[in-house]
A protein has these predicted regions:
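Enzymes that bind and transform nitrogen-containing heteroaromatic metabolites
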Residues: 1-137
């Protein structure tokens, strides 16, 4: 079965991180936190150009293909749609030690109740934490 992953870099207050935060973002050296490895492990990078129904079909195709959708302020509505349509198997959250104060929150209201299992947790010397959650089936 294929797997749809969401990758999100969030501030402590739950806002999608963006390179707009400039120096604070660069000082964290996120390139040393395994982001590139996650991106390389995905066979397909999912963008808003892919329909959610197409992803549902791919998930059921019997392969172990990994589809990665990266949450950014620009793709937030699409990612929210994936979550609402229950098309996500795994959520990879990077939490950075920074409070944005304002911004685009990753999780919004009106999502279906779903139970997730913490599959992996890793902290990095720069204060970044990576949590990987797998959907309970």
């Amino acid at each position: 079965m294929g797997k749809v992953q969401i990758l999100a870099v969030l501030t402590i207050d739950g806002c999608l991180s963006s390179e707009l935060y400039g120096k604070a973002h660069k000082d964290l050296r996120l390139d040393r936190c395994g982001l590139d490895e996650i991106r390389k492990n995905a066979l397909y990078r999912v963008t808003p150009d892919y329909s959610i129904s197409m992803l549902h079909e791919w998930r059921e195709d019997g392969t172990n293909t990994c589809y990665l959708a990266e949450a950014t302020p620009d793709t937030a509505d699409y990612i929210y749609g994936l979550l609402r349509m229950q098309a996500v198997d795994e959520i990879i959250l990077y939490t950075i030690p920074f409070i944005a104060g304002t911004g685009r929150h990753f999780f919004k209201s009106a999502l279906y109740e779903k139970h997730w299992t913490l599959a992996s947790l890793k902290s990095y010397p720069n204060g970044v934490c990576r949590s990987i959650y797998a959907l309970d089936r």
